[in-house]
């Protein structure tokens, strides 16, 4: 099934964003684990896998529309050197995803591609949850202070 070239461009742009997020979250999770924040690392790793599922769905859609998924391009990774920097970097990429998705949904509807629009809407719903989580973590860090917040992210050894 031949897809609209503009819709295929938007799908590949969103694929690039998701592939970038996968790498950024995965590296952040490995760093968090290395720092001893194992519970936080597990959550961040799961977010990386959520982004992978988005990339898979976008890839499937591109292929169905007879397009070629571009896995060779990534946006710049923002790797935080502290938990706060990581949350801020992850939040920035989530805001960028939303800034790209909302006009893309409108264009897909204009092009009569409701399936791609629905896919993008599902991704928006997932990203809204992640934005809420990241904003909450930054608020907690501000309220508790970095040290107390960080202490909450460490797994307790089994007794």
Swiss-Prot record:
Cofactor(s) the protein requires to work: heme b
InterPro entries reported for this sequence: Bacterioferritin (IPR002024), Ferritin-like (IPR012347), Ferritin-like_diiron (IPR009040), Ferritin-like_SF (IPR009078), Ferritin_DPS_dom (IPR008331)
Binding site for Fe cation 1: 51, 54, 127
Residues holding Fe cation 2: 51, 94, 127, 130
GO BP, one annotated term: intracellular iron ion homeostasis
Keyword Transport: yes
Binding site for heme b: 52
CDD domains: Bacterioferritin
Coiled coil stretches, renumbered: none
Source superkingdom: Bacteria
Keywords linked to the UniProt accession: Heme, Ion transport, Iron, Iron storage, Iron transport, Metal-binding, Oxidoreductase, Transport
Enzyme class (EC, first level): oxidoreductase
Pfam families: Ferritin (PF00210)
GO cellular component terms given for this protein: cytosol
Signal sequence residues: none
Function of the molecule: Iron-storage protein, whose ferroxidase center binds Fe(2+), oxidizes it using dioxygen to Fe(3+), and participates in the subsequent Fe(3+) oxide mineral core formation within the central cavity of the BFR protein shell.
Family, as annotated: Belongs to the bacterioferritin family.
Quaternary structure (record): Homooligomer of 24 subunits, arranged as 12 dimers, that are packed together to form an approximately spherical molecule with a central cavity, in which large amounts of iron can be deposited.
Protein name stated in the entry: Bacterioferritin
The species this protein was found in: Mycobacterium avium
Gene: bfr
């Amino acid at each position: 099934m031949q897809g609209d070239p503009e819709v295929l461009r938007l799908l590949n742009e969103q694929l690039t964003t998701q592939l970038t997020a996968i790498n950024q979250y995965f590296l952040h999770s490995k760093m968090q684990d290395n720092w001893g924040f194992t519970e936080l690392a597990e959550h961040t790793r799961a977010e990386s896998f959520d982004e992978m599922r988005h990339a898979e769905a976008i890839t499937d859609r591109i292929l169905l529309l007879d397009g070629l998924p571009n896995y060779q391009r990534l946006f710049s990774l923002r790797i935080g050197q502290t938990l706060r920097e990581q949350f801020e970097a992850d939040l920035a990429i989530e805001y960028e995803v939303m800034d790209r998705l909302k006009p893309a949904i409108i264009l897909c509807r204009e092009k009569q591609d409701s399936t791609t629009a629905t896919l993008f809407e599902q991704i928006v719903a997932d990203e809204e949850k992640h934005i809420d989580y990241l904003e909450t973590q930054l608020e907690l860090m501000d309220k508790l202070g970095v040290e107390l917040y960080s202490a909450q992210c460490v797994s307790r050894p089994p007794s």
